[in-house]
A protein has these predicted regions:
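Hydrophobic/aromatic residues in alpha-helical transmembrane segments
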Residues: 20-24, 51, 68, 212
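A hydrophobic transmembrane-helix motif
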Residues: 1-42
Length: 338
């Protein structure tokens, strides 16, 4: 409405001024009208235009408010997370065995995963590869039950994850992502977020194995150094090393890693890679891989394209197939187009 009112208001105003100016000038020349009276009429027209312009602006604000309100109502009408299964089950001693059995999933009516079958034994590494936007995080979202599978099941140590309390399920995982998050507080407080009752010695040991203790010790306040709200007083690489240390402190059985190390110097990148290798040792790991050189030893590689799983296997078998994975591999190491 405002997009119509505003130009229409301007058109009417300028037409009125033009008509008054022409007629008024003729009357002034005829001696029946004073120049001051003509100026007054034109000023009156401008004064009438002001409230009309305000109405137009108000209309635009009301429209924006209604648009925002409709989105809020739409969000409030969204179904909350599916209620927990009753009675819930528990895993007393998590081993880290993960099974995807005939998993089918898709957003809305679109089917992405059609029949995923993967058996991941405790301590094994699963790499998820594919171009940007291929849907690599979909598997992670299913593991953490941000979405439920349409059919089939995902099991941890033989227990369907839909039968586990969400809080218990998500506590089994440790995460190190490319987009790290640290909150406003001391380094020690940020690390202890994964284990609230950790001792100072445990915190320091976690930092040592994550190759970040030396950096922390060089700071004037050490582990009591306050990270500002934007985390801008430490580098991106240091943030990633701290999140690796936080994962060590939690000591989870299952890991989710995003091994990308963009925007860091070479030395820090090497430390991050070493830290992740240490972290994965003896733990079931799901790695969102961007550089295929880092996942050659993966027990299983899931290859995704356009949201669908197109290939599945280990590094050697996928190269032998000479399919999409082999094309990605050559594009990185031989400079060929895929």
């Amino acid at each position: 409405v405002s997009s119509t009112i505003a130009p229409l208001n301007s058109l009417v105003t300028y037409l009125a001024i033009g008509i008054v100016a022409v007629i008024g000038t003729a009357e002034v020349l005829a001696g029946t009208f004073l120049v001051g009276q003509l100026q007054a009429f034109i000023r009156y027209i401008w004064q009438i235009n002001d409230p009309l312009s305000q109405i137009s602006n108000l209309s635009a604000q009301i429209q924006a408010a209604f648009a925002a309100l409709s989105r809020i109502v739409e969000l409030l009408d969204e179904q909350e997370e599916i209620p927990e299964a009753m009675p819930v089950k528990h895993i007393a001693d998590v081993q880290g065995n993960v099974q995807f059995e005939h998993v089918k999933f898709g957003y809305y009516e679109e089917n992405l995963m059609k029949d995923l079958n993967v058996n991941v034994k405790s301590g094994q590494m699963v790499a998820i590869v594919g171009p940007t936007g291929a849907g690599k995080t979909t598997i992670i979202n299913l593991l953490l039950r941000f979405y439920d599978v349409k059919s089939g099941s995902i099991k941890i140590d033989g227990v369907d994850i839909r039968d586990l309390p969400r809080e218990e399920l998500r506590s089994m995982f440790g995460m190190v992502l490319q987009d790290t998050w640290l909150f406003n507080g001391t380094i020690k407080e940020n690390l202890m977020y994964s284990k609230l009752d950790a001792s100072d010695q445990e915190v320091q040991e976690a930092c040592k194995v994550a190759y970040v203790d030396h950096f922390v010790q060089t700071l004037e306040a050490g582990y009591d150094t306050v990270i500002n709200e934007e985390s801008s007083n430490i580098s991106q690489g240091q943030k990633q090393l701290l999140t690796i240390a936080r994962a060590f402190l939690k000591d989870p059985k299952i890991l989710i890693l995003d091994e990308a190390t963009s925007s860091v110097d070479t030395r820090t990148e090497v430390l991050i890679q070493k830290g992740m290798e240490r972290l994965m040792k003896g733990r079931t790991s799901f790695v969102i891989a961007h550089r295929l050189s880092t996942i050659r030893d993966a027990d299983t590689i899931i290859v995704m394209k356009d949201g669908d799983i197109v290939e599945l296997g280990d590094h050697d078998s996928l190269l032998e197939k000479d399919g999409f994975y082999a094309s990605l591999y050559r594009s990185q190491f031989e400079g060929l187009d895929n």
